[in-house]
Amino acid sequence: LKLKSGQVEGYAEGQEPLVYLRTTVQAVMRAGCPFVFTDGHGLAKFTRWFDEPAHLDAIDWPLVRDRFWGDTLDDSDRKRRKQAEFLVWQGLDWDVLDGIGVLNAGMQQRVQGIISGYPERKQVPVHVTRHLYYP
């Protein structure tokens, strides 16, 4: 929300330039990429860190998928848990991706144009995923 509303110092381009790169845990593992993931925002002191997929159930998946972030009177830890992270060490090869999400059709065309400039590389599908962005 801060990004969308211009509240991030030094950044004023809004959400449109942001793209979501999609893969799966299984694909990351097959590629041999070291990774860690959290059950909430990585800077919170009580966030737990994992490096074994058996612990993926520690993530509050329904909350991660929920459109709303805010803490409630009944649950004062929603905001932290919604910010669970999956981090890949140093980088991820392009071939591990299975999709790219963008804000709108204009950005979809732009990203597809960039990808098509590399015909020797995997042509990752680009989808408009408006639901991943703030309204």
What are these regions (language model features)?
Residues 1-135:
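Active-site-proximal loop/hinge segments that shape catalytic or ion-binding/gating pockets
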